[in-house]
């Protein structure tokens, strides 16, 4: 499957988002569970990194379901590490997947260091509570069902900032299938619009290694 992400033109991204907004309302609630089942698991982009070592580093990525955390929707804990430095987890955060329309709410951890590596420990994750999180309302991702994947795109306008005073905003878009997660996460200068971090060679292409990381849920 060939998927192309990431127009550099803000107007193109805005037009694409408006199209998604119109179509997302028709998304079935059953897609919430399908999307969550596809997302859950352990991923690696090792094949991509070996093929293009100049542009991509090998990364291990986890999405672990949090059945206890939210009264609505489905929660996930996600984090990753560079496979050259295994165990040094970063970008630990929490997602809330909601229906009607299908979307993702992003949360940062108030104490990032305290939860680094928690994707490997279910008992530890069971202690995670809403008081440990800070909602990032500007970082909502709208998800649209397409013929062979789910496509996600962050709200346009540069509103996703980890801290109110940040001069850089985050833009994320992705395509998800049952076996592949293709994501392009980038930072942009809020004044100039120039990219400040993230891949400049296209999205990271993660292959699912283990469909469900831990034993089946009760």
Swiss-Prot record:
Highest taxon, organism lineage: Bacteria
Keyword Ribonucleoprotein included in the entry's annotation: no
Stored Gene3D superfamilies: CpcT/CpeT domain
E.C. no: 4.-.-.-
Pfam families: CpeT
Keyword Lyase included in the entry's annotation: yes
Molecular functions per Gene Ontology: lyase activity
Keywords: Lyase
Protein family membership: Belongs to the CpcT/CpeT biliprotein lyase family.
Biological role stated in the UniProt entry: Covalently attaches a chromophore to Cys residue(s) of phycobiliproteins.
PANTHER family on file: CHROMOPHORE LYASE CRL, CHLOROPLASTIC
Protein name, per record: Chromophore lyase CpcT/CpeT 1
Organism expressing this protein natively: Synechococcus sp. (strain JA-3-3Ab) (Cyanobacteria bacterium Yellowstone A-Prime)
Gene encoding the protein: cpcT1
């Amino acid at each position: 499957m060939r998927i192309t992400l990431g127009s550099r033109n803000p107007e193109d991204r805005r037009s694409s988002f408006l199209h998604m907004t119109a179509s997302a309302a028709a998304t079935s609630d059953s897609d919430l569970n399908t999307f969550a089942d596809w997302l859950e698991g352990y991923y690696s982009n090792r094949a991509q990194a070996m093929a293009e070592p100049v542009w991509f580093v090998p990364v291990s990525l986890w999405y672990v379901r949090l059945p206890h955390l939210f009264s609505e929707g489905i929660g996930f804990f996600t984090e990753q590490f560079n496979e050259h430095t295994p165990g040094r987890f970063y970008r630990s955060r929490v997602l809330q997947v909601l229906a009607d329309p299908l979307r993702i709410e992003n949360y940062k951890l108030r104490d990032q260091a305290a939860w680094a590596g928690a994707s490997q420990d279910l008992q530890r994750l069971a202690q995670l509570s809403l008081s440990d999180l800070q909602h990032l309302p500007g970082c909502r991702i709208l998800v649209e069902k397409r013929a062979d994947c789910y496509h996600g795109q962050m709200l346009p306008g540069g509103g996703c900032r980890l801290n109110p005073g940040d001069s850089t905003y985050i833009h994320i878009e992705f395509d998800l299938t049952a076996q592949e997660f293709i994501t392009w996460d980038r930072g942009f200068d809020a004044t100039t619009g120039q990219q400040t971090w993230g891949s400049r060679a296209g999205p990271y292409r993660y292959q699912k290694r283990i469909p469900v990381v831990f034993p089946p849920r009760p």
